[in-house]
Amino acid sequence: MKKNTHPEYRQVLFVDSSTGYKFICGSTYQTDKTEVFEGQEYPVCYVSVSSSSHPFFTGSKKLVDAEGRVDKFLKRYSGIKQSAPKPETVVEDVLPKGKRKSPAKKKK
């Protein structure tokens, strides 16, 4: 087997940036940042959503939006008025009554 082909597998500290929740998990994530957790120093990875903040796991319907995407959307489209529904127009036959085509018959 070739040496140095796979990244190093190690314990990494993951930090949920929206709740501050920290947990350790094995990973090949590469970083220079480290943080002390429970008396040991670990490489750290900051995540925006984890099981402590995701609505599926928390059971809440609260939307956590760190980047402000919802606010940006609301600001952009809040001034737009909905257009009134267009009234239906009556379509009249163009061909005179005697010149109308009969519907095509299906062949058996």
Swiss-Prot record:
PROSITE patterns: RIBOSOMAL_L31
Region (Disordered) location: 86-108
GO cellular component, one term: ribosome
Transmembrane segments: none
Pfam families xref list: Ribosomal_L31
Domain of life, source organism: Bacteria
Protein keywords: Ribonucleoprotein, Ribosomal protein
GO BP annotations, alphabetical order: translation
Compositional bias ranges of the Basic residues kind: 97-108
GO molecular function: structural constituent of ribosome
Family of the protein in this entry: Belongs to the bacterial ribosomal protein bL31 family. Type B subfamily.
Subunit organization: Part of the 50S ribosomal subunit.
Protein name per its UniProtKB record: Large ribosomal subunit protein bL31B
Species assigned in the record: Chlamydia trachomatis serovar A (strain ATCC VR-571B / DSM 19440 / HAR-13)
Gene: rpmE2
